[in-house]
Amino acid sequence: MAKNLKITLHHGIVNRTPAQRATVKTLGLNKIGKTVVREDTPANRGLVNAVRHLVTVEEVD
């Protein structure tokens, strides 16, 4: 069974770099408190790592 990542945006993107804003948008997050579930792939891990100070991540099945 494939693992998934539950990603929640906990900090806003105001006053963040354009790259960080684009990364948050790519993950499908647009409001504080919004949660998305994404497949656990190296690409998604890299996106999360780039904005790790703005999001929380949980592994789910």
Swiss-Prot record:
GO biological process terms, semicolon-separated: translation
CDD domains: Ribosomal_L30
Any Pfam family matching the protein: Ribosomal_L30
Gene Ontology CC, one term: cytosolic large ribosomal subunit
Statement: the UniProt record of this protein carries the keyword Ribonucleoprotein: yes
First and last residue of the signal peptide: none
Record's keyword terms, sorted: Ribonucleoprotein, Ribosomal protein
GO molecular function, one term: structural constituent of ribosome
PANTHER family xrefs: LARGE RIBOSOMAL SUBUNIT PROTEIN UL30M (PTHR15892:SF2), MITOCHONDRIAL RIBOSOMAL PROTEIN L30 (PTHR15892)
Family affiliation: Belongs to the universal ribosomal protein uL30 family.
Subunit record text: Part of the 50S ribosomal subunit.
Name of protein: Large ribosomal subunit protein uL30
Gene, per the UniProt record: rpmD
